[in-house]
Structure formats: C-alpha cells, structure tokens
Amino acid sequence: MPIHRTAYLFRCAEEADCSAVSELVNAAYRPADAAAGWTSETALVAGPRTNPAQLLALLQRPRSCLLLACCEAGHIRGCVHIEADRDDAYIGMLAVWPQQQGSGLGKQLLQQAEQWAIREFGARQLLLSVIQQRSEL
C-alpha cells in the first residue's frame, strides 16, 4: 500500500469528538481483523480499548489534552493523550488510523505532543508507558 503524505491540523479534542476518537483507538488497538498490524492488542487484551465515556472523562481532567491529527477534510486520523503532573507530562493512547500507519503520522503526533506539553504545561520531562506484554516495545 502506498504511503500518502498529508498535512494535518493538530488540535485538542472536544466532547463532540469522543465517538470518533473511540472508533479510531479501537480500530488501531483492537481490530476485528486477526491479520491486523503490529499495534493490535487483540491477542493480549479482550474487549474494547476505550469508549466515548472514558474519553470524555480524560477531556475533563485538569491539565489534560487529547491531541488530534485531522486531515484537511476534518476527519480524525490520529490521536495522543497528554496529561501533566507537576514538571512531567505523561503521553499515552497514541493511535493512528490503520490505513495511515507507517506514514509518519505517529512520529508527527509525538512531536506535536512534546511541543504541546512544553508550551502549555511547562513540562520538563515526557514519560511514555507501553503495555507490559509487548516486550518488543
């Protein structure tokens, strides 16, 4: 599959985005297709990765941003959660729509998250956790 380079608009999610972000995250981490890409956790963890109510709770936390990457048409293609705690910022829920994986969007999201955390939260250190069953990460 060819990789298409696209310019993205990065913005914090709003309540109206929660359903679309839930669909994105679940498609990236818990796809129905057994032949899914490397990000799939289907064989490791049962059930959906998130839901709109959980995402709304993230949005309502102080010093928290669910950063979205939107294409020119406005469709959400990726996300990453940033949450500040004192001088640290925690990065999580990095997800890219399966059709865009391998395009460099994940890297762009991490770069944008780093800039956001420094600019908006004054973070001095960024921390990223991965699921312990993924020893290759």
Please provide the spans of the model-predicted regions.
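Conserved N-terminal entry element of GNAT/NAT acetyltransferase domains
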Residues: 1-19, 23
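Hydrophobic adenine-recognition pocket in adenosine-nucleotide-binding enzymes
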Residues: 13, 94-96, 130
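Conserved GNAT-fold acetyl-CoA-binding loop/helix
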Residues: 26-55
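A short helix-loop-beta-strand connector motif used in the catalytic cores of GNAT acetyltransferases and
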Residues: 48-68
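Conserved beta-strand in the GNAT
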Residues: 68, 75-83, 90-95
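Conserved acetyl-CoA-binding loop-helix of GNAT-fold acetyltransferases
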Residues: 96, 102-115
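Conserved beta-strand-loop-alpha-helix junction that forms the acyl-donor binding cleft
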Residues: 101, 127-137
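Conserved GNAT acetyl-CoA-binding A-motif
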Residues: 110, 117-130
